[in-house]
């Protein structure tokens, strides 16, 4: 049995015990108590699968947590703050642009725009966004630029629909790339986006998309105005 699996179960058991003590003092709200009940069932199932006694695992988990806390400073216990990363300058973010053949699609809480009159261009995607725990947290603005600096596409959050995940952003980027590539443009993304928006990309700095997916994405954005 993998040692990480065992220690993870032990720590989960102890943390559940701490939460149970908290609830016993009538300090937990309804969602807290609901999660406590669901997690209890989950721990019982995991204990049966692993063949481990929950009470014994709880004691072992307490020792693990105590060792960790002994090594932690007060500074380390602070919640890390999001980092704000910028591919674009203020001028690039605030510049007005227009489309000869405008196409627009709303995907969840993100709005995707592109100019389908653009053909046979080398295009780079740049974005300004915040990062939390080394993952994209909030997209501020993403724009597609030609080598000449013209803006030909954009992804922006909708003010009326706040909240999006890194997967939402990744999917929106895929739609934008598919639409631009439909017109024989070559699209790549900035190194910053490669690092935080997705974990795998090809040598051209863009996520690998099979031809059938690119065609599907292009048709999707083609049908939305």
UniProtKB/Swiss-Prot annotation:
Keywords: Eukaryotic host gene expression shutoff by virus, Host cytoplasm, Host gene expression shutoff by virus, Host mRNA suppression by virus, Host nucleus, Host-virus interaction, Inhibition of host innate immune response by virus, Inhibition of host interferon signaling pathway by virus, Inhibition of host PKR by virus, Inhibition of host pre-mRNA processing by virus, Inhibition of host RIG-I by virus, Inhibition of host RLR pathway by virus, Interferon antiviral system evasion, RNA-binding, Ubl conjugation, Viral immunoevasion. It comes from the Viruses. Upon interferon induction, ISGylated via host HERC5; this results in the impairment of NS1 interaction with RNA targets due to its inability to form homodimers and to interact with host EIF2AK2/PKR. It is found in: Host nucleus; Host cytoplasm. Residues 1-73 are annotated as: RNA-binding and homodimerization. InterPro entries: NS1, NS1A, NS1A_effect_dom-like_sf, uS15_NS1_RNA-bd_sf. The keyword Ubl conjugation applies. The keyword Nucleus does not apply. Residues 218-225 are annotated as: PABPN1-binding. One of its GO terms (biological process) is symbiont-mediated suppression of host gene expression. Residues 200-225 are annotated as: Disordered. Its main location: host cell. A motif (Nuclear localization signal) lies at residues 34-38. One of its GO terms (molecular function) is protein serine/threonine kinase inhibitor activity. Residues 175-210 are annotated as: CPSF4-binding. A motif (Nuclear export signal) lies at residues 132-141. One of its GO terms (cellular component) is host cell cytoplasm. Belongs to the influenza A viruses NS1 family. The dsRNA-binding region is required for suppression of RNA silencing. HAMAP family: INFV_NS1 (MF_04066). Homodimer. Interacts with host TRIM25 (via coiled coil); this interaction specifically inhibits TRIM25 multimerization and TRIM25-mediated RIGI CARD ubiquitination. Interacts with human EIF2AK2/PKR, CPSF4, IVNS1ABP and PABPN1. Inhibits post-transcriptional processing of cellular pre-mRNA, by binding and inhibiting two cellular proteins that are required for the 3'-end processing of cellular pre-mRNAs: the 30 kDa cleavage and polyadenylation specificity factor/CPSF4 and the poly(A)-binding protein 2/PABPN1. In turn, unprocessed 3' end pre-mRNAs accumulate in the host nucleus and are no longer exported to the cytoplasm. Cellular protein synthesis is thereby shut off very early after virus infection. This is Non-structural protein 1. It comes from Influenza A virus (strain A/Chicken/Hong Kong/715.5/2001 H5N1 genotype E). The lineage of its organism: Viruses, Riboviria, Orthornavirae, Negarnaviricota, Polyploviricotina.
């Amino acid at each position: 049995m993998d040692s990480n699996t065992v220690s993870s179960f032990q720590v989960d058991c102890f943390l559940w015990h701490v939460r149970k003590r908290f609830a016993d003092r009538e300090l937990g709200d309804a969602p807290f108590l609901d999660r406590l009940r669901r997690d209890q069932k989950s721990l019982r199932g995991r204990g049966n699968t692993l063949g481990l006694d929950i009470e014994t695992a709880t004691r072992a988990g307490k020792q693990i947590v105590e060792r960790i806390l002994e090594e932690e400073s007060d500074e380390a216990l602070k919640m890390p703050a999001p980092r704000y990363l910028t591919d674009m300058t203020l001028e690039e973010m605030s510049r007005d642009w227009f489309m000869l053949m405008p196409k627009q699609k709303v995907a969840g809480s993100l709005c995707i725009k592109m100019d389908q009159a653009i053909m046979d261009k080398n295009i780079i995607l740049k974005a300004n966004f915040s990062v939390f725990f080394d993952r994209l947290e909030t997209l501020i603005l993403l724009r597609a630029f030609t080598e000449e600096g013209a803006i030909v596409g954009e992804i922006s959050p909708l003010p009326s629909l706040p909240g999006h995940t890194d997967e939402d952003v990744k999917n929106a980027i895929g739609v934008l790339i598919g639409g631009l590539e439909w017109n024989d443009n070559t699209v790549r993304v900035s190194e910053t986006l490669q690092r935080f928006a997705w974990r795998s990309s090809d040598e051209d700095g863009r996520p690998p998309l099979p031809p059938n997916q690119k065609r599907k994405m292009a048709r999707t954005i083609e049908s939305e105005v």
